[in-house]
Amino acid sequence: MVSRRGSETKAIVCVLTDRIRISNQWVSHLSFAGLLGVAGFVFAQQHGLFRNLNNLKLFSGREKDSGDDSFLVPGLQNLGNNCFLNVILQALASCKDFRSFLQWVLEDARGSLAGEQEEQLPLTFALSALLQELGTVGSRRSVSNPRKVMVTLTDYAKNFNLTSQQDAAEALLHLISSLQEEIVVCYRPSQSSNLSDILFSRNLRMLAPSEGLHGLMELKRWHKHLRGPFDGILGSTLMCRTCSSQISLEFQFFHTLPLSPLLHHGGYNIMSGCTLEHCLKKFLNTEKVENYFCYRCWHGAALKYLSVIGAAETEIEKLRSCGGEDQCDCKTSLHLQRMPWSNSYSHILKQLIIARFPKLLCIQVQRASFNMFEEFKLSGHIAFPLVLNLSLFTPSSIGVNIEERIEMSSEYQKPEASKNHGMYRLVTVVEHFGRTGSGHYTVYRSVRVFSQEEEEEDCDEDLSWFSISDSEVCRVSESDVLGAEASLLFYERL
């Protein structure tokens, strides 16, 4: 079967060959080769493959050494199909909070580790050094080597081949989990405290009994090791709209938010005008849960049923005093098996909530999809902002009060108390070209270009964007970045 794009290319070739046929004689082989080149160029233009053509030096009107355009960040060597890891490393280099986290871990471990940091924390040490190198802005082109990070990462992610094409989002998760494993194993409680005294309660609160002020400080130190800048918390709540009761509330940590785009009818292309906010609403939207048994609704219906049939007051009182939990045996003990009951009595809704925002928000746009024959890639642009406001997705904004149910210490609540805790700034965009399971990754990353005197001012006017494809680096505009068909988006909390 010939693909749709293959058919279009063939059609372009046929049109052009018809126009240059002279006296029923074909043009030379050289001309025909040129013809194929023209056809390929036209095809690429029609499918938007050259939308960033102006970024190439061949088509750029910029002078290499003119003004600030001479400033560049280092590229990364491709050591064999590891572009998926290179874009993650470049992305992390633009995440100030992540670099600071690694530096804090190394500084905190300096006094407690018996050996050298490079031996005890090899991945943390290698990654921190590489990210510092990638954050250096210079006037000359330079290329860094990710080999040390790859070697140390392989020791933790043994089943993840770093020299064959992989998914960039999966590489990020392997890197984060490997760092956590290394940091937690090398953690040493200070003085006489014991890790066994630090307990985890069911509501995710960590407790340090009988430790006093020292125990609280140790708890904060352990908590800082445990939670990285990518750690957020998702809440999942089940609510019955019939009886207005909250059936369950569960929490789980997340490192990335997997968002599905809005699709055209048929599900092969992303809907025109789709935005990141649309994807977030879809992810957090309420959904009806079928075939779910609401015990509170059932007990209410059972009370009415017993009253109608004239049951004994003792049975009614027993039913009324029942808590309606999962271990309830009212149905058998009160002979209510014959009571008419169906899910029509209950209207159960499931709602996801971002209960705690991470310092660094990584959004994964799920472009891989399946039909009954094959896996394919969802093409199309999703509009994303330079500044993202997540305050619209807090529990209070959607009418669900969960604050009273999350008993966490005030130290954990402080980051959420800020009125700007839901505001994020875009720092990196990862883009994938080609089909699922193959192709090539590139990255757009933001860098602040300033002098030493201006470093503390942290002005948005000094923010520059670079397009990076392994070792190739060029400066681009914000419009180029916003036009990317993003696979991963990295946002930093303001």
Swiss-Prot record:
Keywords: Hydrolase, Membrane, Protease, Thiol protease, Transmembrane, Transmembrane helix, Ubl conjugation pathway. It is a single-pass membrane protein. Its EC number is 3.4.19.12. Residues 74-494 form the USP domain. The active site is at C83, H440. GO terms for molecular function: cysteine-type deubiquitinase activity. Coiled coil: none annotated. Its main location: membrane. GO terms for cellular component: membrane. GO terms for biological process: protein deubiquitination; proteolysis. It comes from the Eukaryota. The chain crosses the membrane at residues 30-50. PROSITE patterns: USP_1, USP_3. It catalyses: Thiol-dependent hydrolysis of ester, thioester, amide, peptide and isopeptide bonds formed by the C-terminal Gly of ubiquitin (a 76-residue protein attached to proteins as an intracellular targeting signal). Belongs to the peptidase C19 family. Recognizes and hydrolyzes the peptide bond at the C-terminal Gly of ubiquitin. Involved in the processing of poly-ubiquitin precursors as well as that of ubiquitinated proteins. This is Ubiquitin carboxyl-terminal hydrolase 27. It comes from Arabidopsis thaliana (Mouse-ear cress).
